[in-house]
């Protein structure tokens, strides 16, 4: 019996992405284009196959008109919208401004663009919900593309709070992990798109054989509770590739979620996605920590807290029925078992140098343990506190027990644990505990106000003003300077007024923390290894020493040992205004200085997005991803009146740098100053006034006239000499002598007056004509680096002498 030969399925995973990129390249190169779209007097070339695949309208049009290269004239369609639609059809994504979104979707609906107007039967399309279309698609196996990069502040605040309330009720009741229905289709339209580590699923390409992975993923998206929540918003106002993420779950099975955490930085507006993801992992072997009320996550970002009342689920995945309250110290241990990567508020990167030891993850800590143990258990929470980023001069990583990390006075058990914990702490730590409790209550009050007022910038400013008013909870120096205090090399280099305000208590805090995170701007990319503290170096005398807050506190002595050898020597710039509240709005703008200019006065930072306040005064909303883009904008558009300019001494053209001005002199004016003369450079060497130029012209003209007058006088002398030689034979000797004397006197008079013979006007006229032909007066001014030479004394014309052609009458002989 003959056995059937085996068949092998060869599949290229990048086939779909390759087709996408190739079609896009062909569009930009205008290769193989077979249709022209005429819009607003302009034309766009495209491929009929792509347009037909993405729009039933174009498909019907091309089938009914089978021309080789048709020209489609689209009336009442803006050119920019049609170009954006082409980008969407070829790439599957497009960026649209908020004010143009409605008109753009209306055009897409009129042209019946797939992914923007249609809704599948099994799953609502977010983009179609935003467009308001109610039609259903015929292709049930194809996943519809989603809109990306739409500004997330289109979602109203009330929708956010309602969705959070539904989530909280579902979590408390112990329901199935499926998500509640969103209160509005617009919110589902603007939910972030899920990114995966595989090619994007294309519409119309499913054949039942090669898309098993895609079908499984799509089915998983419908059954899993992380349907709309596992995504990230590809927002143009945020920078990606940040290591900070909110994927805390240690389950190795969800590799897609772990991969996507490095794709983009989540914003405050994607709060629902984080809540959905926490609810979805009921099958994990770790305790799920779920918030039970819908509040914005300001307190979570500031204090490293993720819950107020905690509901626990069994490891098997089944709910325990009524939500039971876990002790606060158990929550601390649970948080230490999984490293928490909190998202940053202002776009700064946080990197943990080392993690906690496994011995601290086993049994829960009790409130009766010694203070170093409590401090060691709360190291992770201290490192996750974003007060060191958010508040300059605030509580720099204070020693706060776990009771203060979670919203107090919510659960009676939590309040009792907080009181018992506070009794065990010394007096110097009690002040810091009270300070952080006050800050946390302030954050809760601010969150309630934020639910009513949509402006998060006002909330931010109110928090900072409250911090400035209560100096009792603030230390006098910022976290950035305290990092420098640990260095043995820099301890003696930055001894200024700000560093003298460092307290011994802060130094002890830094030395006792087993894990410490880098949040300074200067070192966010450096990866220096010497920032973790050494607990063995802490002595009981240092622990019990009071905090010296006076300006006369001596600087701490430089440390020795392995830590000094491990940390490299690094000089960093220290900000002098440590207690200033005006520039507390964004600490990550510490280094925003271009040539000494304060560019921060033009900026307002809201959730990591830089907005130009100067342009906002003119009703122009300009936002920037990072501070370097804003620096360029502020320097070019708003600092032009204040920056120093270097004008060209010849044409007065302004330059921003002196070397550009000198290069302009060399190239344009054909002039170059040697390097040795740069210090003594004077523009007067290169400028000739109009009066001096007129004097030069007059002097040259007079010199040339005098020269020709002398030549004419010599010719007249020769003629007179020939006449005298002929007449001398007819005159008596005594008369000849007398006539010669008279002739000499007349010659001297003629020479002294510089005149011509009055009896010969024709000669004088001819001489004048020759003078006008030979003398050419140039209108150009010759500029040279050296002073103009003075005319020789022999050619100088005495002042007061006239150049008359005939001044005296000569008697006829």
UniProtKB/Swiss-Prot annotation:
Ranges in a coiled coil: none
Biased composition range(s): Low complexity: 125-145
Question: One Pfam family name from the record?
Answer: BTB
Note whether Zinc occurs among the keywords: yes
Where is this protein localized, as stated in its record? Nucleus
For the BTB domain, which residue ranges apply? 33-98
An example Gene Ontology biological process: negative regulation of DNA-templated transcription
Annotated Basic residues bias: 192-201, 560-578
What GO molecular function terms would the record report? DNA binding; DNA-binding transcription repressor activity, RNA polymerase II-specific; POZ domain binding; protein homodimerization activity; RNA polymerase II cis-regulatory region sequence-specific DNA binding; zinc ion binding
Extract the ranges annotated as region (Disordered). 118-148, 171-324, 356-428, 526-585
- Phosphoserine carried by residues: 203, 205-206, 682
Q: What does this protein do?
A: Binds to a number of sites in the transcriptional regulatory region of ftz. Isoform alpha is required to repress genes that promote the R7 cell fate. Probable repressor of the transcription of the segmentation genes ftz, eve, h, odd, run, and en. May bind to the region 5'-AGGG[CT]GG-3'. Degradation of ttk is directed by binding of sinah or sina, via the adapter molecule phyl which binds to the BTB domain of ttk.
Tell me the subunit arrangement: Interacts with CoRest/CG33525, suggesting that it acts by recruiting a CoRest-containing corepressor complex. Interacts with phyl.
Q: What is this protein called?
A: Protein tramtrack, alpha isoform
Gene symbol here is ttk
């Amino acid at each position: 019996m003959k056995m059937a030969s085996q068949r092998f399925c060869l599949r290229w995973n990048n086939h779909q992405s390759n087709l996408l990129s190739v079609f896009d390249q062909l569009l930009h190169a205008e290769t193989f284009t077979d249709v022209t779209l005429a819009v607003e007097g302009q034309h766009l070339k495209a491929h009929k196959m792509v347009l037909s695949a993405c729009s039933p309208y174009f498909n019907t049009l091309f089938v009914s008109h089978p021309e080789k290269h048709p020209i489609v004239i689209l009336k009442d369609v803006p050119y920019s919208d049609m170009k954006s639609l082409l980008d969407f059809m070829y790439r599957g994504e497009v960026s649209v401004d908020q004010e143009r979104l409605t008109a753009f979707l209306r055009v897409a609906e009129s042209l019946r663009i797939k992914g923007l107007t249609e809704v599948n039967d099994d799953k609502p399309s977010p983009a179609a919900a935003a467009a308001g279309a109610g039609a259903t698609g015929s292709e049930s196996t194809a996943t519809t593309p989603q809109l990306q990069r739409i500004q997330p502040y289109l979602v109203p605040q009330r929708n956010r709070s309602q969705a959070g309330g539904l989530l909280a009720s579902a979590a408390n009741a112990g329901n199935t992990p499926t998500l509640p229905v969103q209160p509005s289709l617009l919110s589902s339209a603007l939910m972030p798109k899920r990114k995966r580590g595989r090619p994007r699923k294309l519409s119309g390409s499913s054949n039942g054989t090669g898309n098993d992975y895609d079908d499984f993923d799509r089915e998983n998206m419908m059954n899993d509770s992380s349907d709309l929540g596992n995504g990230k918003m590809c927002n143009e106002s945020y920078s990606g590739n940040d290591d900070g993420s909110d994927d805390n779950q240690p389950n190795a099975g969800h590799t897609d979620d772990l991969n996507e955490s490095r794709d983009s930085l989540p914003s405050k507006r994607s709060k629902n996605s984080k809540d959905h993801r926490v609810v979805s992992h009921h099958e994990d072997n770790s305790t799920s920590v779920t918030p039970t009320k819908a509040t914005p996550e300001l307190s979570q970002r500031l204090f490293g807290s993720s819950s107020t009342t905690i509901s626990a689920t069994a490891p098997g995945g089944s709910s325990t029925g009524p939500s039971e309250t876990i002790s606060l110290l158990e929550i601390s241990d649970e948080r230490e078992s999984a490293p928490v990567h909190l998202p940053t508020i202002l776009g700064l990167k946080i990197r943990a140098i080392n993690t906690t030891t496994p011995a601290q993850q086993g049994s829960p800590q009790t409130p009766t343990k010694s203070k170093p143990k409590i401090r060691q258990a709360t190291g992770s929470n201290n490192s996750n506190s974003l007060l060191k980023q958010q508040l300059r001069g605030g509580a720099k990583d204070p020693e706060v027990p776990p009771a203060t990390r979670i919203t107090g006075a919510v659960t009676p058990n939590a309040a009792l644990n907080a009181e018992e914990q506070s009794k065990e702490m010394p007096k110097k730590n009690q002040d810091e505990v009270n300070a952080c409790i006050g800050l946390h209550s302030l954050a809760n009050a601010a969150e309630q106000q934020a639910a009513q007022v949509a402006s998060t910038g006002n909330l931010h400013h109110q928090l900072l003003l409250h911090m400035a008013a209560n100096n009792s909870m603030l230390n006098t120096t910022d976290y950035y300077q305290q990092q420098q205090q640990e260095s043995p090399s820099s301890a003696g280099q930055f001894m200024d007024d700000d560093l003298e305000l460092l307290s011994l208590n802060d130094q002890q805090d830094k030395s006792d923390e087993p894990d410490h995170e880098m949040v300074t701007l200067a070192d966010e990319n450096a990866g220096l290894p010497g920032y973790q503290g050494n607990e063995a170096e802490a002595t009981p005398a240092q622990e019990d020493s009071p905090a010296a807050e006076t300006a006369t506190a001596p600087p701490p002595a430089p440390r020795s040992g392995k830590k000094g050898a491990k940390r490299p020597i690094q000089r960093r710039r220290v900000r002098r205004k440590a207690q200033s509240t005006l520039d507390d709005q964004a600490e990550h703008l510490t280094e925003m200085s271009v040539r000494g200019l304060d560019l921060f006065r033009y900026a307002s930072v809201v959730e990591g997005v830089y907005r130009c306040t100067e342009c906002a005064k003119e009703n122009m909303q300009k936002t920037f991803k990072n501070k370097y883009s804003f620096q360029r904008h502020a320097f070019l558009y708003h600092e032009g009146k204040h920056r120093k300019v270097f004008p060209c001494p010849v044409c007065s053209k302004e330059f921003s740098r002196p070397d550009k001005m000198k290069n302009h002199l060399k190239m344009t004016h054909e002039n170059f100053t040697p390097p040795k003369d740069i210090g003594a450079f004077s523009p007067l060497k290169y400028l000739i006034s109009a009066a001096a130029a007129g004097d030069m012209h007059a002097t040259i003209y007079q010199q040339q006239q005098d020269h020709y007058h002398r030549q004419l006088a010599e010719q007249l002398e020769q003629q007179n000499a020939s006449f005298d030689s002929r007449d001398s034979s007819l005159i008596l000797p005594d008369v000849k002598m007398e006539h010669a004397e008279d002739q000499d006197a007349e010659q001297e008079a003629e020479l002294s007056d510089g005149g011509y013979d009055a009896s010969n006007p024709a000669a004088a006229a001819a001489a004048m004509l020759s003078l006008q032909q030979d003398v050419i007066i140039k209108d150009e001014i010759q500029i040279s680096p050296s002073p103009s030479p003075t005319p020789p004394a022999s050619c100088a014309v005495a002042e007061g002498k006239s150049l008359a052609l005939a001044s005296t009458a000569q008697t006829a002989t």
